[in-house]
């Protein structure tokens, strides 16, 4: 079964149409009483469940689910003395296994709470052209029988790109899910995680922080693709490009997390620049990309100091802390799969290779797959990496040991075999392959054309 882009478009339009109705019925997280913690929550241990509720998921996964839950839990921001709370959405398939748990890192790529999975997956309001792809990847794990937990990893500040926040809140989301008595999980449950692009930030930092922040978790492997492992390198690469909107999205998320960065940016950004920084707090990734197509965020209409704000010590030091592989203490202690297109025009390949080299020097167990096909791009690799990522996670959860040490190999695929997992998975893999169709090419020409038409 191969769905073409026309069918994918219908699925996306259907999601939009449904969202117009659903949004009227659902409260946004900042309006929803469920998200307000009870008295005394600050004194609880991280990962403690403060409240739970059963919910309905309105994306395409709904037919694969026995039930879904949301858990409000205690967590932190960048340090232990910054207590906060957030929510994870737990999806339970009909054939659920209680010896395995998958952390699915959805890529929000925005600071707006309407884009958090706790809201968008309930409202059916995933708003970008890859929405069906993201849902289909989650469906792979549900179809296999894995319980999937999907944290709102940005917290109340909308900390997009702030890896220490995303990592801590993801690990605490795992703790909360394992402790939830309706699932039959335990501290011995095997845990693995998968994420792509913005979800790769979440997975990369959960993997990095696990050894020091949550050493008790039985994590057996992590899978990540299209990883923005170095935000400075990403900003330098995409500024002025069709994907320039992710520059302001990242700056907004980091400044919301680190007060010293926010204070500095308020001094050096223009009035227009500060107005631009408000946009990612209200809109999701597609709206952000459309608003800032080809925008130069080093220009004088945005910054009084040109590109120098990126290299000012107060900003540079934080961005260095948010670069994977710079601190030996934050080296993954569970096997990790990295998948990156050599021609990735959003998340620079060279930065991921440097992270890989740094982790390996510290004794990590990492497999780097380089997608070398000239047609491989950031968007196409979402699909190309989905099947090998799933197979790798499944092997780890089934107790198969990953190859020791570090190793690399090249992959020239630019699609997936929809028959690879048998009849039960054929429709899901068809949705994924359908996103590629026959129009994906170098530098994500299909997506760029889509964004231009919808500007």
Curated annotation (Swiss-Prot):
Top-level taxon: Eukaryota
GO biological process: lipid catabolic process
Subcellular localization, as worded in the UniProt entry: Secreted; Secreted, Cell wall
Pfam families attached to this UniProt entry: LIP (PF03583)
Disulfide bridge partners, by residue number: 115-284, 360-406
Catalytic residue list: 197 (nucleophile), 344, 378
Chain positions carrying an annotated carbohydrate: 98, 230
UniProt xrefs under SUPFAM superfamilies: alpha/beta-Hydrolases (SSF53474)
InterPro entries found in the cross-reference section: AB_hydrolase_fold (IPR029058), Lipase_secreted (IPR005152)
Keyword line: Cell wall, Disulfide bond, Glycoprotein, Hydrolase, Lipid degradation, Lipid metabolism, Secreted, Signal, Virulence
GO terms assigned for molecular function: triacylglycerol lipase activity
A GO CC annotation given for this chain: extracellular region
Primary location class: secreted
The keyword Glycoprotein belongs to this UniProt entry's keyword annotation: yes
Keyword Glycoprotein: yes
EC number: 3.1.1.-, 3.1.1.3
Catalytic activity: a triacylglycerol + H2O = a diacylglycerol + a fatty acid + H(+); a monoacylglycerol + H2O = glycerol + a fatty acid + H(+); a diacylglycerol + H2O = a monoacylglycerol + a fatty acid + H(+)
Range of residues in the leader sequence: 1-19
Function: Secreted lipase involved in Dandruff and seborrheic dermatitis (D/SD) probably via lipase-mediated breakdown of sebaceous lipids and release of irritating free fatty acids. Has triacylglycerol lipase activity and is able to hydrolyze triolein. Mostly converts monoolein to di- and triolein, while free fatty acids are only produced in low amounts.
Similarity comment: Belongs to the AB hydrolase superfamily. Lipase family. Class Lip subfamily.
Protein name in the entry: Secreted triacylglycerol lipase LIP4
Organism lineage: Eukaryota, Fungi, Dikarya, Basidiomycota, Ustilaginomycotina
